């Protein structure tokens, strides 16, 4: 059978890659080990979070499915960091894991141009030593394709650890992929080993919730997808519960360090720095007398709870003892024990910004195979890989998001230029231009791309453009409207509880005060009071960041100009202060014609580009003399 695109793996990356490909009109085949597990949430029953919510909003703006699925299957919605600025707030939703999986499976089955097939891909078909042309499966079938996208998750040589016990698996009790990473290594790709883990799941009927703190959703929940009707969005919300470990818990754990695979050398791969196991936390933060735990329902039935904050690969007797030492969990019945899993990944610096491998043509990687952690990071990569595979077939320009355009751009740029030796997680602090890259404006930033690729329909893009026009009109009006200290103005400010002004002030700066809310906005800018509250909130946010955004836009224009700078053949990188030997070696080898081309070389950081640009200007000036 012949296909345009074959996607290997039905996780969060594989779903977005295959849907994007099919929706762009390409004959697509999604091959996965278990069709029932398409869209499975292998670890926590939640989507989003700090910076992760940005990724979901961005992939939704381009035409991805994760946001819509979350809105349809979520059982609790919250805005994290709600008391802080909009740039660092993050949307998060608890999901019904079963319904999420069912939704994604149904979408995949009902999408034109997309076929779903259950099997294990055992090998890539390669011609001319460096060109993928299809895959071979365990049932000995061969499928020919123009492009192949690998989204293998934790399945490549997956090895589960629970105490001294270990067994081969891609996920608990699911078969691993045993041959694929060996072939990738033989093809010259650098393959490494990483580790992640998950906590035990508990029977709800055995938990004493009455002694825990209830943690509910927002009163007025906001959907993830820009395409979800906000006025009709009223999901049934279920609470989570908070409890804590204690000194007894820590004593049980620390006295069994000698049995922990993490410390005995049984586990070789590095785990996620920002999501450590409970034994790692107790070891690293010995001075802490407790750690917070969240009990999260896995489905709307609330029969099984996930212990967020207690990931572990300790032996089952130790897991049982430590869980029973926690307040409210004294009689908890364990349905599934926590475990760690090691798996193979491919060094992401082996990739282009399109997520195609540099050494092997037509082969794309997305998700945990690229050393990332998290459903959202995986889904974002899957979307980009799927889009670029299609664009390459059509011989069109690749889709590469800049760091100033999207968190997705930051994610991919970090991976392919800097690389990582531990599971990579997205944070707002990784984005230099985070004031521009807010959740609520993702559609304004990115929907035009989705429409261009046929992933966003005409009606949606029309709404986005109308929204853009309204916001721009409001900001332009406020940026040119002066408020003076006349009697009427002072009385108005006093009536809404705002500090008086002593001199004239631009309305945009007045609205930019932290104390301004929708009510005050309507009083100060009555000509825009008729807009819906979501739009008014966005105008207020734009006003708050107005001055900062102006500064960042100037920085971006400066950066764009810098990237266009040409580099003469006679320019030498040797001896430039601040550049590592590795970077100098790569630059001398590749001889990039422009600074933009230099930025695409792995290991060449933004700081290195600044050094090159500075010395390039000196070189050009001296050459002219």
Curated annotation (Swiss-Prot):
SMART domains attached to this UniProt entry? GIDA_assoc_3
What positions does the entry give for FAD binding? 9-14, 121, 177, 368
Q: What are the BP-aspect GO terms?
A: tRNA methylation; tRNA wobble uridine modification
Give any Gene Ontology cellular component.
cytosol
Q: Which residues bind NAD(+)?
A: 271-285
Asked whether the keyword NAD is assigned, the reply is: yes
Q: Which cofactor does it need?
A: FAD
Location of this chain's protein in the cell = Cytoplasm
Q: Name one GO molecular function term.
A: flavin adenine dinucleotide binding
Keyword line: Cytoplasm, FAD, Flavoprotein, NAD, tRNA processing
Family assignment from sequence similarity: Belongs to the MnmG family.
- Subunit and partners: Homodimer. Heterotetramer of two MnmE and two MnmG subunits.
What's the stated role of this polypeptide?
NAD-binding protein involved in the addition of a carboxymethylaminomethyl (cmnm) group at the wobble position (U34) of certain tRNAs, forming tRNA-cmnm(5)s(2)U34.
What is the protein name stated in its UniProt record? tRNA uridine 5-carboxymethylaminomethyl modification enzyme MnmG
Organism name? Aliarcobacter butzleri (strain RM4018) (Arcobacter butzleri)
